[in-house]
């Protein structure tokens, strides 16, 4: 059995050793739920890594969005280089679900763009879970959506072993049943090709490795792993396992049974629609479903096959769909990061999906069984989740109820950094006072974050500060994700001194250069000025030893009182620790990632300006990457392997940039 092995120059420090011991003790005593209260800069990811290493259990880490999931994935990948660290998020770059607008009688067809790199990583994740135990999967909350059943996914594999007999026609047919395509010219992921007594397979979970099978008659003599671009042999294998090119592959018998069940449901629902005098809806449903049935019969797949998933998995109406949780071993461990945000998201996902599909069913676009192609209900997720550690600086009511209010605190930072000093000032003339504070902070070479209550106030304040010649930017919800990260990078580099926002300056923003966080109208109770929001916003100044927070308020609200009191409590604990061990607080100097640092873009004749333009325009990016891919294969076919390798590196650079900046 493979063991987890941390490769790091650091050892647990600060509050980490105590937190690790307490969480592990709780796991060993079979506690189903624990709460890790980890503040900004305390080393939550490293703490989770040490818990994983010591318990040696397969682990799922859930984050509330792709950006945070990618951040954790990259960190875990560097901590566990010898183990399987996987990334499982939605593979759509763009997704428009099918919908029907009754008021205008408008049907919106499903439209999507699949990210091949993320699809590859999803296949790699499920494969690792089925083949080994030293696996850490970092997923977004979208992992509670339906996925192909693990038993069917594993059943639909081709096992290859040296010395065994594989009739050629049967092997090729098996690969086609796994939805691999034969392509003797353009060899890419999810394809196979045949040359004499060789069969080359490009597995769905690899981007830069393929397998060459060499036969003597029907006997498998060699399995070589090779570079599909240059043809260079990498290693020799004794055996290999080919998984499906889709999570929805299934045996022909299952497809035939499903077709029969779909036909039965179709007839029943047509009778229902006709009894309601919905003749147009009945005709529409019959046409759409019959077309899907023909495609399933002829090809084993159809567009929107996931809407019939209940029939393929053998589940009854209303039963939960198979998800990533069914791929987890029974002794798996779950970390739910930023649980105060993730829990409400999990609660909401089912209802929003259900409302859209009920309209489709009612108007004859889908069968009622489409309602079972859905995310898990919260109660189902609660049932399926394994032993869980909730992780948050501000635990929500669900986590506290589940853990009986008991939390494991991780509030001592190894760096000695204190929680920022919180100063409360009158909201009257808050802008004039803010300008004075801004000037003082900029003089120190530090940056400023300002959070307002309304969009109009943020816009007006930004314009006002810009008129005063301050380098100010307004961070709002309409800004594209990649542009948002560029803005934050400009802030860290000093191209921007002040960032103004509403609800965007909370979880996951790492700005060690931040010396001041100003919270305007802090006494206006509500979502944006709740205890949780205030603590999260205050935390943005916790990565700099000179960081401070000013709350502009004319009255003391319960939220301000609790947030400031909690910050003061944490500050005092850190001060005592620093005094005891003679630690001088040091600002966290994390690297400012530039596009050049992702890979040597200039070596491939793609400058930063070009890269930024591409990354901020998904359509152009996809077109450019498709062009690069064609040029790469053309160079390889012309035996220009050096040029092909350069083009491949450039493709990898862009793919990695998209992942890190997504």
Swiss-Prot record:
SMART domains: DEXDc (SM00487), HELICc (SM00490). A motif (Beta-hairpin) lies at residues 91-114. Residues 25-414 form the Helicase ATP-binding domain. One of its GO terms (molecular function) is ATP hydrolysis activity. Keywords: ATP-binding, Cytoplasm, DNA damage, DNA excision, DNA repair, Excision nuclease, Nucleotide-binding, SOS response. InterPro entries: Helicase/UvrB_N, Helicase_ATP-bd, Helicase_C-like, P-loop_NTPase, UVR_dom, UVR_dom_sf, UvrB, UvrB_inter. GO terms for biological process: nucleotide-excision repair; SOS response. Residues 430-592 form the Helicase C-terminal domain. Its main location: cytoplasm. Residues 622-657 form the UVR domain. It is found in: Cytoplasm. The keyword ATP-binding applies. One of its GO terms (cellular component) is cytoplasm. The beta-hairpin motif is involved in DNA binding. The UvrABC repair system catalyzes the recognition and processing of DNA lesions. A damage recognition complex composed of 2 UvrA and 2 UvrB subunits scans DNA for abnormalities. Upon binding of the UvrA(2)B(2) complex to a putative damaged site, the DNA wraps around one UvrB monomer. DNA wrap is dependent on ATP binding by UvrB and probably causes local melting of the DNA helix, facilitating insertion of UvrB beta-hairpin between the DNA strands. Then UvrB probes one DNA strand for the presence of a lesion. Forms a heterotetramer with UvrA during the search for lesions. Interacts with UvrC in an incision complex. Belongs to the UvrB family. This is UvrABC system protein B. It comes from Rickettsia typhi (strain ATCC VR-144 / Wilmington). The gene is uvrB.
């Amino acid at each position: 059995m493979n063991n987890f092995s941390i490769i790091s120059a650091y050892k647990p420090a600060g509050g980490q050793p105590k937190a690790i011991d307490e969480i592990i003790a709780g796991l060993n005593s079979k506690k189903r739920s624990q709460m890790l209260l980890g503040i900004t800069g305390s080393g939550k990811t490293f703490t989770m890594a040490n818990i994983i290493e010591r318990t040696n259990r397969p682990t799922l880490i859930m984050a509330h969005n792709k950006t945070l999931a990618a951040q954790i994935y990259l960190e875990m990948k560097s901590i566990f280089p010898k183990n399987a660290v996987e990334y499982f998020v939605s593979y759509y770059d763009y997704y428009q679900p099918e919908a029907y607008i009754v008021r205008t009688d408008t049907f919106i067809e499903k439209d999507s763009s699949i990210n091949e790199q993320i699809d590859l990583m999803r296949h790699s994740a499920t494969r690792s879970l089925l083949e080994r135990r030293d696996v850490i999967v970092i997923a977004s909350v979208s992992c509670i959506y339906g996925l192909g059943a693990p038993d069917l996914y594993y059943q639909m594999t081709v096992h290859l072993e040296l010395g065994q007999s594989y009739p050629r026609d049967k092997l090729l047919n098996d690969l086609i049943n796994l939805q691999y395509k034969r392509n003797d010219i353009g060899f890419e992921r999810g394809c196979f090709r045949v040359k004499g007594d060789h069969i080359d397979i490009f597995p769905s979970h690899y981007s830069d490795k393929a397998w060459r099978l060499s036969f003597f008659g029907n006997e498998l003599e060699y399995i070589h792993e090779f570079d599909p671009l240059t043809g260079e042999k990498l290693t020799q294998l004794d055996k290999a396992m080919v998984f499906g090119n889709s999570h929805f592959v299934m045996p022909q018998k299952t497809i035939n049974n499903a077709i029969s069940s779909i036909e039965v449901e179709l007839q029943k629902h047509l009778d229902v629609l006709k009894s309601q005098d919905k003749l147009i809806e009945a005709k529409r449903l019959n046409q759409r479903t019959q077309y899907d049935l023909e495609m399933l019969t002829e090809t084993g797949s159809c567009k929107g096959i996931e809407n019939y998933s209940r029939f393929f998995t053998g589940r009854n109406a209303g039963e939960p769909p198979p998800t990533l949780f069914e791929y987890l071993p029974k002794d798996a461990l779950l970390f739910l990061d930023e649980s105060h945000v993730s829990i409400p998201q999990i609660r909401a996902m089912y209802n929003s999906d259900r409302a859209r599909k009920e309209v489709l069913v009612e108007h004859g676009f889908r069968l009622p069984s489409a309602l079972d192609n859905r995310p898990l209900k919260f109660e189902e997720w609660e049932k399926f989740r394994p032993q869980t550690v909730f992780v948050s600086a501000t635990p929500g009511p669900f986590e506290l109820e589940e853990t009986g209010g008991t939390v494991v605190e991780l509030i001592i930072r190894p760096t000695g950094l204190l929680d920022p000093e919180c100063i409360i000032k009158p909201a009257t003339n808050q802008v004039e006072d803010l300008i004075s504070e801004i000037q003082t902070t900029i003089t120190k070479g530090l940056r400023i974050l300002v959070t307002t209550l309304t969009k109009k106030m943020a816009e007006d304040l930004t314009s006002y500060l810009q008129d005063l010649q301050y380098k100010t930017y307004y961070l709002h919800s309409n800004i594209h994700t990649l542009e948002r990260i560029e803005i934050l990078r400009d802030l860290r580099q000093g191209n921007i001194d002040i960032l103004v926002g509403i609800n965007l300056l909370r979880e996951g923003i790492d700005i060690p250069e931040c010396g001041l966080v100003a919270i305007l109208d802090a006494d206006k109770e509500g979502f944006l000025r709740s205890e949780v929001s205030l603590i999260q916003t205050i935390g943005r100044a916790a990565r700099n030893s000179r960081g401070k927070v000013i709350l502009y308020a004319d009255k003391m609200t319960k939220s301000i009182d609790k947030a400031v009191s909690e910050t003061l409590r944490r500050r005092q604990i850190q001060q005592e620790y620093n005094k005891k061990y003679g630690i001088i607080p040091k600002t966290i100097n994390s690297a400012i990632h530039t596009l050049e640092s992702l890979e040597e873009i200039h070596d491939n004749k793609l400058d930063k300006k070009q890269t930024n333009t591409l990354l901020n325009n998904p359509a152009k990016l996809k077109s450019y990457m498709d062009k690069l891919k064609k040029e790469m294969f053309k160079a390889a076919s012309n035996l220009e392997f050096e040029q092909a390798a350069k083009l491949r590196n450039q493709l990898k650079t862009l793919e990695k940039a998209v992942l890190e900046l997504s």
